[in-house]
């Protein structure tokens, strides 16, 4: 499995939207890391304007299903239709573990929400590994965003699964 992440929209978009809500003019500039951290922790709506595209190459089909179940994630999954690609067997015979290329468009709020569930020790090991790879790619671009991608026990201060 390979993962790449591209930040599609800049943080300046969120800053300008937040300024608009308090009657200030847009600045059209990148906000400070301190501002990003505060707005992410507060989970204010402008963070939904910061969008990322996650590209998975050779992701197990069933791991992708775990990820696409989250609301506000927009999936683009390589079709398994026999009229769209050459398969070695019929579509009905493909195992759940078959690998597939999958892209997901998400925003900063969605990254926080998915991390709460998919970084949890109760998530499947394979799904945790896939999401940790996403977090690692995010960290290369935006350590502030990556720092807010935590499991539910860290987010809430206790294990909601009563399992930690």
Give the positions of each predicted feature.
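Family-specific signature for flavin-dependent thymidylate synthase
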Residues: 1-164
């Amino acid at each position: 499995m390979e993962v790449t992440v591209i930040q599609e929209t800049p943080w300046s978009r969120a800053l300008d939207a937040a300024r608009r809500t308090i009657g200030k003019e847009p600045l059209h500039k990148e906000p400070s890391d301190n501002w990003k951290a505060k707005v992410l922790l507060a989970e204010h709506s402008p963070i939904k304007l910061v969008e990322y595209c996650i590209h998975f190459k050779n992701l197990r089909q069933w791991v992708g299903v775990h990820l696409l179940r989250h609301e506000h994630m927009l999936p683009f999954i390589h079709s398994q239709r026999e009229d769209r690609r050459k398969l070695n067997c019929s579509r009905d015979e493909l195992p759940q573990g078959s690998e597939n290329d999958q892209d997901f468009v998400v925003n900063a709020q969605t990254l926080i929400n998915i991390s709460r569930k998919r970084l949890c020790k109760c998530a499947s090991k394979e799904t945790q590994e896939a999401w940790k790879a996403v977090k690692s790619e995010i960290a290369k671009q935006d350590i502030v965003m990556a720092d807010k991608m935590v499991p539910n026990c860290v987010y809430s201060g206790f294990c909601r699964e009563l399992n930690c």
